[in-house]
């Protein structure tokens, strides 16, 4: 018996790999997008700090710009440094 494939339609999904399911700043799901973006994906990436907390890039940048003196992680209050 031989089987011949006449048509194949591949389907894929993507998912960010993060410790939490939601951004600690905007509370939106990581597999969605932040309030500033319209579409999830590469235009709304996740960023990690050296403290291992993860946020939407736009959310943490707004948070850091609002800090007056030192920039701290909104979750653990350690000095914020982007993970390399």
UniProtKB/Swiss-Prot annotation:
Zn(2+) 1 binds at residues 23, 26, 56, 59. CDD domains: RING-H2_APC11. It is found in: Cytoplasm; Nucleus. Gene3D superfamilies: Zinc/RING finger domain, C3HC4 (zinc finger). GO terms for molecular function: cullin family protein binding; ubiquitin protein ligase activity; zinc ion binding. Auto-ubiquitinated. Its main location: cytoplasm. It holds the Pfam family zf-ANAPC11. Pathway: Protein modification; protein ubiquitination. Keywords: Cell cycle, Cell division, Cytoplasm, Metal-binding, Mitosis, Nucleus, Ubl conjugation, Ubl conjugation pathway, Zinc, Zinc-finger. Zn(2+) 2 binds at residues 51, 53, 73, 76. GO terms for cellular component: anaphase-promoting complex; cytoplasm; nucleus. A zinc finger (RING-type) spans 34-77. One of its GO terms (biological process) is protein ubiquitination. InterPro entries: RING-box_E3_Ubiquitin_Ligase, RING-H2_APC11, Znf_RING, Znf_RING/FYVE/PHD. Zn(2+) 3 binds at residues 34, 37, 44, 58. The mammalian APC/C is composed at least of 14 distinct subunits ANAPC1, ANAPC2, CDC27/APC3, ANAPC4, ANAPC5, CDC16/APC6, ANAPC7, CDC23/APC8, ANAPC10, ANAPC11, CDC26/APC12, ANAPC13, ANAPC15 and ANAPC16 that assemble into a complex of at least 19 chains with a combined molecular mass of around 1.2 MDa; APC/C interacts with FZR1 and FBXO5. Interacts with the cullin domain of ANAPC2. Interacts with UBE2D2. Belongs to the RING-box family. Together with the cullin protein ANAPC2, constitutes the catalytic component of the anaphase promoting complex/cyclosome (APC/C), a cell cycle-regulated E3 ubiquitin ligase that controls progression through mitosis and the G1 phase of the cell cycle. The APC/C complex acts by mediating ubiquitination and subsequent degradation of target proteins: it mainly mediates the formation of 'Lys-11'-linked polyubiquitin chains and, to a lower extent, the formation of 'Lys-48'- and 'Lys-63'-linked polyubiquitin chains. The RING-type zinc finger domain coordinates an additional third zinc ion. This is Anaphase-promoting complex subunit 11.
């Amino acid at each position: 018996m031989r089987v011949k494939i006449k048509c194949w339609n591949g389907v894929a999904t993507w998912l960010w790999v993060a410790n939490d399911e939601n951004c600690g700043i905007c509370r939106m799901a990581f597999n969605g997008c932040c309030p500033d973006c319209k579409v999830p994906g590469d235009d709304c990436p996740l960023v990690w700090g050296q403290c291992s907390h993860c946020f939407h890039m736009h959310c943490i940048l707004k948070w850091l710009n609002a800090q007056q003196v030192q920039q701290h992680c909104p979750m653990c209050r350690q000095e914020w440094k982007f993970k390399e």
